[in-house]
């Protein structure tokens, strides 16, 4: 459960991402594909090379979903309901992949905002991404 301090940290950190959200999403996806090659199996139709338009496009979708989750941090199940349905019923993404992408997002944010990535912010973002993952996998049951 996100505390008021966690919510504040997440909103502040995501606010600093600003117009770079799509780029960070794409970078996190690239990190995931390189670090965890089995994740590529969900994207057989994508050009997964560095800077690919498809990876950038999906990175923007990831970032937009996270921006939506930040904006609706008190009601993520409703805000992410359609996305949860998509991943559970159509795409059938293995839930472990959300943890892998979350880790890569944390690394990406830390690399771009080292001064702002304090232990408290890191912990809050980790809890937030875990909450997003929980919501996205809630309809798998």
Curated annotation (Swiss-Prot):
O2 binds at residue 58. The keyword Metal-binding applies. The modification Phosphothreonine is found at residues 108, 134, 137. The modification N6-succinyllysine is found at residues 7, 11, 16, 40. The modification Phosphotyrosine is found at residue 24. Coiled coil: none annotated. This is Hemoglobin subunit alpha. The gene is HBA.
